[in-house]
Amino acid sequence: MNFYAPQMTGVIADNLRLDDQEATIRAINKVIPAVVSIIITEQVTTTVINLNTGQQTEQKSKVRKGSGTGIIISPDGLILTNKHVVNVAGEKTAEYRIILNSGRQYYAQFIGKDPINDLAVLKIFDKNLPFVQLGDSDKLQIGATVIAIGNALGRYQNSATKGIVSGLGRNIEASDQSGNTSETLDNVIQTDANINLGNSGGPLVDLDGNIVGINVATDQTGSSIGFAIPINDAKPVIKSVREIGRIVRSRLGVRYHMLTPELASQLKIGLNSGAWISINNDGTPSVLDGSPADKAGLKPGDIVMEINGIKLQDKTTLLSVIQKYKPGAKIGLRVFRDGKIIILTTVLDEFR
């Protein structure tokens, strides 16, 4: 009797590799027409003094401030990118030049920045523009293949890198290149697909060519550790712009850390999930004065376990649950304080 299983295994493996390659190419080709390069310039005024006459004149010029990547999310030109991409220049003095993969160029209007996440929205004015399909980041699993696309290093337009989802629900402290500005990002996707400088604001794509994340940061102390904002966390921003014309976010008004086994051990509590309201020794308030959290009676050291019956844990962070509700919504909080469970209520206001 002859056995051909090893040969068949090789054929199957070759076919799987070919299928994976074809799927990757299809996904990239589907998305790239809607991936744009963003060039930010700012108009500056310089005072020139004539040494002979002492006369002063003002000269205006444009200075390039930075670049990044964005994605067109609607046929009428809404563009999603990172807040830190547009933050390099003032909103009133900046110009945003948009370059499509086809070579077409536009100047974009600034729509708004997300006050709680590293997201911003621009708009170009045209019809029938190429746009991406939004996926469902809640369905992502560790090990899933993903592709990061962006304007790498500000020079290599629409570069694509491939990897897998390495982790979900990560909480990171992200800073700009200067290190002067930092922001805590909750619930981000970790991937080993290289996210190079300039890729910020570009899409993280699954093999069906659907956007599952917005590339946002890389850990420069490690190798192949990149992060993306889940597209489902961006959907409220998109919905708000479409319905209201600006970005509206709800606010509770606390600074917190999601519980981890390490933090729970440090705090010497028996809980394994929830949002711990920070106890800050630097004078920074963890419950903002006059905020809905303040009015509810939340205190530093409290652990918010549930909001309206939704348990706070890895994928349902305090921030993500709050964003399910509009400003003015009444919410109930199940809180652990001094070994006891208490129930508090409050009304959310708008994050400004």
PLM region descriptions:
Residues 2-266, 271-273, 279, 319, ...:
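Serine-dependent protease modules
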Residues 27, 301-304, 333:
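Flexible, small-residue-rich helix->loop connector segments that border functional cores
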Residues 125-128, 276-286, 305-308:
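Acidic- and glycine-rich mobile interface elements
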Residues 254, 286-287, 301, 314-315, ...:
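PDZ peptide-recognition modules
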Residues 99-100, 206, 299, 306, ...:
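A general beta-strand register signal
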Residues 79-80, 290-315:
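Conserved PDZ fold ligand-binding element
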Residues 87-92, 306-334:
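PDZ domains, with a preference for the canonical peptide-binding region formed by the helix
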